[in-house]
Design a protein with these regions (language model features):
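Short helix-terminating capping/connector loops at secondary-structure junctions
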Residues: 19-21, 39, 74-79
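Generic, low-specificity signal for short hydrophobic/alpha-helical stretches with a mild N-terminal bias
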Residues: 7, 25-28, 43, 65, ...
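Helical scaffold of the NTase/Pol beta-like nucleotidyltransferase catalytic core
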Residues: 1-26, 57-58
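Catalytic metal-binding acidic patch
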Residues: 29, 34-60, 83
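Conserved NTP/Mg2+-binding pocket subregion across the NTase superfamily
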Residues: 63-132
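Generic detector of bulky aromatic hydrophobic side chains
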Residues: 26, 36-39, 45, 87, ...
């Protein structure tokens, strides 16, 4: 499976879990900048939804990387996805609500998710472009 196929497969799974919540998936960082390097890069992802993620959705999403690794043994990409999933409102306002975090140190359900300033600038520019 190629990097592009892995991203599409993961995106399809996320959309399936968040059905009815109108998820928008953003890939940013080295993949978006065409600078992905196997063994060095991760796959930065932000998933923004119309409404707060439900407890059941969060429970499914928090373990999705592991599920995908079990389904596709030996795939080098699924463990590299890192980022957050939360409502667009919580992302923009910083309000506390259920969020899913995937990172190098593991994954968890939390009450917020913040991205680094470079990723934030890139994502806000994309949001601005998408809404104007």
């Amino acid at each position: 499976m190629t990097l592009s196929e892995a991203i599409r497969t993961m995106a399809d799974e996320i959309v399936s879990v968040l059905a009815g919540n109108e998820p928008t998936i953003y890939i940013f960082g080295s993949v978006a900048l065409d600078d992905f390097r196997p063994g060095w890069s991760d796959i930065d992802i932000a998933v923004l939804t119309k409404h707060e993620i439900t407890g059941q959705q969060a429970d499914t999403l928090v373990g999705l990387r592991q599920v995908m690794l079990e389904r596709f043994p030996g795939n080098p990409y699924f463990r590299l996805f890192e980022g957050g999933m939360l409502s667009l409102d919580a992302f923009l306002s910083g309000k506390k609500e259920r969020a899913v975090y995937w990172g190098t140190s593991g994954q968890r359900i939390d009450d917020s998710w913040k991205m680094d300033s470079f990723g934030m600038a890139e994502l806000l520019e994309r949001l601005k472009t998408a809404t104007t």
